[in-house]
Amino acid sequence: DQLDTPYRPGGWTVRQLVHHCADSHMNAFIRFKLALTEKNPTVKPYDEAVWADLPDANLPIESSLATLNAIHLKWGVLLDSMKEEDFKRTYFHPEKKRSQGLEEVTFLYAWHSQHHLAHVQHLVLRENWSFGK
């Protein structure tokens, strides 16, 4: 199955990549809300590689695509409502040993989706996959 093809040698499969995006964006959205409601809260890191090996990483990707759609809808509502000063709010990331502002986080997660989409697009081209109409 194409979804179980690693996007690069030794890398995650397309399926794991989609589930990773949902996991990552769920965590980011919660961190975002914490920063909007608390003063520089310390967020909880997680081991994304271990999460990618949990049993839910074998589910059909539709579950994570639906999760991403829902999170992005909610996140969009928050972003649309934010004032300039809200983007200066921060959270502390213990693995990075620094605070991250919501403006930086917004750009980071917009990039994150595009970055992983590019992995899949390159795989499709490299493998010369075609999709019926």
Residues of each region from the PLM?
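Short, contiguous alpha-helical
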Residues: 4-49, 73-76, 90-133
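Acidic/histidine-rich alpha-helical segments that form the ligand environment
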Residues: 31, 51-89, 109
